[in-house]
Amino acid sequence: MKKYLFAAACVSMFAAAPSYAADETTQSFETGLIPSPHIFLPQGEVKGAVFLISDAAGWGDSEKTEADRLVSQGSVVIGVDFPSYMEALNRYDVSLNDGCIYTVSDIESLSQQVQRAAGNSPYHLPIVAGIGEGGALALAIAAQTPDATIGQTFVVDPHAGIPLSKELCTPAQKKVVGDRSVYGLTDGSLPDPIIATFTPAADKDGRAHVEDLKKAHDAIEIRDSTDDAQTVFADTLDDLVTASGAFDNPLGLPLAVLEAKPNLDTMAVIYSGDGGWRDIDKVVGGMLQKEGIPVVGIDSLRYFWTERKPQETADDLSRIIEFYRKQWKVKHVLLIGYSFGADIVPATYQLLKPEEKRAVAQISLLSLSHQVDYVISVMGWLGQKTEGAGGDPIKDLKGANPKLVQCIYGKDDDDDVACPAVKDVGGEVIELPGDHHFDENYDLLTKTIIDGLKARLKG
């Protein structure tokens, strides 16, 4: 991406008059606890999405100048006024949400709404970024972020902690220093990459806090810069926006590849639910990996963000199967879909190329419904009914070998769960305890899938 050019005499990039002034959109969005965000949409293809959190003084000329610059280069920008947001969070009645505040749902929802309004460009996981107090808030948000939700956390000269008296919903460690709450990060791998850059003007307590975070999470990247905060902020955001559209695999698809030494001569392909590759999809994939089944996970949120045709979906699946069967030297394929991902699997399987179709040893449909969609609906993600324009997966199963089909659902799932109807086409139906997410008993769910696979491989 071409970078914005600065005159050598400029002390700050914000000292120069912007060459492009973006107008805030007049469209309405559900913003949750974020009060009156400043939302800007680019013209043409979306190249990235940035949640730009202001410093302590609030949304002003410097933030608007940076937003203008990002929008001119193709980014969606959602500007957050730090003082008004903190005021809203401190006013929030936490008894409405189990005694704590969860900020990430508003960020995720707003990112999806705004990117959908921007057109049919690929979906970009948002970058959450800020300087000073904005950086401190970005780090606190990272303390409660699930996987595959935020694309990147980027902070410059962050302070230590945030002036919030209410609890954030997170198991991460917390300490109170004066009127500020200082959060650690949750155990395990980072939910998204974190970069913290420090200039000569950085707050020493803020740096000490990030260094403490890095002691527990070595993947955090700490950088030093002799530039001023605004300049290094802009330059780094350019690089991060460019990288946000790249996929780290030869097929150019939004995949999660979990390597394993195969012990069942089988690989798995998992289509995630509409929330993307996280939670149930990621956990089940990891458990299969530990059992010696290498996994390719397809992030349905990103893959189906723009509408796909059924044959296009099947052709991409054929490419995945062909490429990774050769790479892992396996004969069989375990084809799994969860929720939205389960709904598209039957028709996709039917349209596979003959060789790849013959390789499928089991089709595991988890929390199947009666409605197929080949595009993510923001309303569906918010819990509302989708149109099901792609038909009914039960009809798509007709003609498939019923001995391959395993449909698993939770006893307490919605009334419109489709698994019971799979009996009518001769497939195996398994009821497990729990709801749409199987009460998060993923050990039992994975065991059920593997037991079925082993039986089918023998038979």
Question: What are these model-derived regions, one by one?
Answer:
Residues 226-245, 310-313, 440-453:
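Post-His helix in hydrolase/transferase enzymes
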Residues 83-101, 274-276, 295, 299-312:
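Cap/lid segment of the alpha/beta-hydrolase catalytic domain
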Residues 22-45, 223-263:
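N-terminal cap/lid segment of alpha/beta-hydrolase-fold proteins
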Residues 95-120, 140, 307-328, 343-347:
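Alpha/beta-hydrolase active-site loop
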Residues 160-214, 259, 373-426, 430:
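The feature captures the conserved acid-bearing segment of alpha/beta-hydrolase catalytic domains
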Residues 113-189, 323, 331-391:
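Primarily recognizes the serine-hydrolase "nucleophile elbow" in alpha/beta-hydrolase
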Residues 84-85, 224-232, 301-304, 432-438:
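Histidine-bearing beta->alpha loop at or near hydrolase active sites
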Residues 42-75, 79-82, 250-293, 297-301:
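Short, surface-exposed "cap/lid" segments of acyl-processing enzymes
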